[in-house]
Design a protein with these regions (language model features):
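Conserved N-terminal beta-strand and adjoining loop/helix that marks the start
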Residues: 2-25, 44-47, 95
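Short Gly/Pro-enriched turn/cap motifs at secondary-structure boundaries
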Residues: 4-8, 86-87, 115
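Short connector loops at helix/strand junctions that flank enzyme active sites
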Residues: 11, 33, 40, 89-93, ...
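Short, charged/polar surface micro-motifs in flexible loops or helix N-caps
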Residues: 19-24, 33-34, 46-47, 76-81, ...
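Conserved Nudix-box catalytic region and its N-terminal flanking loop in Nudix hydrolases
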Residues: 24-65
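Nudix hydrolase/Nudix homology domain
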Residues: 35-38, 104-167
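A short coil-to-beta-strand element that immediately follows conserved catalytic motifs
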Residues: 66-76
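Active-site-adjacent beta-strand/loop module that shapes the phosphate/pyrophosphate-binding cleft
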Residues: 79-110, 124
C-alpha cells in the first residue's frame, strides 16, 4: 500500500541555475551507490531558513560564491525517493537563476572532505551542447531534461511562473 502524499517526509531544497552568456552551466557531480548524477549547486534548507537564505548559504559552501545576484524562481522539481540516511522520503527543489557573467573557478568554503561526505565530488562548467550530447547511459542529469530546460531559459527567458521540470 502506498503512503498518502501528506504522510511523506519531503525535504525542502533550493538550487542555483548559473548560466554564463556563452552558455556554460555550473554543475556538481554527486556519487550515489547506484549512479553518478550531475546536478545544479544547492541543497536542503536548515531549520528556520528561507529558500533565498539557504541558496546564499549553499552557494558559499559548495561554490565559494559570496553575494550572488539571485534572480527569478524558474523551476520546481519534486521526486519521491528515499534518501540514503532514511530521514526523508523525497525532495522538493526550487531552482533560481543566479547571475554568472563569466566562468569562474569554484572555491568552496567547505573542505573537499566535507563535500564528499555529502556525496559531492566535483564542480564543473558544462557547455549546453555538452549536456545535449551526453547521451550515454552513465551520464545522468538532474533534472533529467536539464539541457531542454536550460535551452528554454536561454531562448525564451525566465518563465512567468515556475515550471515543473519533471524528474
Amino acid at each position: 500500500m502506498t503512503e498518502p502524499a501528506s504522510a511523506l517526509r519531503i525535504r525542502q531544497a533550493v538550487r542555483a541555475v548559473l548560466i554564463t552568456p556563452d552558455h556554460h552551466i555550473l554543475l556538481v557531480r554527486f556519487e550515489f551507490p547506484t549512479r553518478t548524477v550531475w546536478s545544479l549547486p544547492g541543497g536542503g534548507l536548515d531549520p528556520g531558513e528561507t529558500h533565498l537564505q539557504a541558496l546564499r548559504r549553499e552557494l558559499i559552501e559548495e561554490v565559494g560564491l559570496h553575494d550572488p545576484v539571485v534572480g527569478t524562481h524558474v523551476w520546481n522539481r519534486e521526486h519521491i525517493i528515499p534518501h540514503l540516511d532514511g530521514r526523508w522520503d523525497g525532495q522538493r527543489d526550487r531552482y533560481y537563476l543566479v547571475s554568472a557573467s563569466e566562468r569562474f573557478v569554484p572555491a568552496p568554503a567547505l573542505s573537499w572532505e566535507q563535500l564528499r561526505a555529502e556525496r559531492l565530488h566535483e564542480l564543473r562548467w558544462w557547455h549546453l551542447d555538452e549536456i545535449d550530447q551526453a547521451t550515454d547511459a552513465d551520464t545522468w542529469f538532474s533534472p533529467r531534461a536539464l539541457g531542454h530546460h536550460v535551452r528554454a531559459l536561454i531562448t525564451d527567458g525566465p518563465p512567468v511562473a515556475p515550471i515543473d521540470t519533471g524528474i
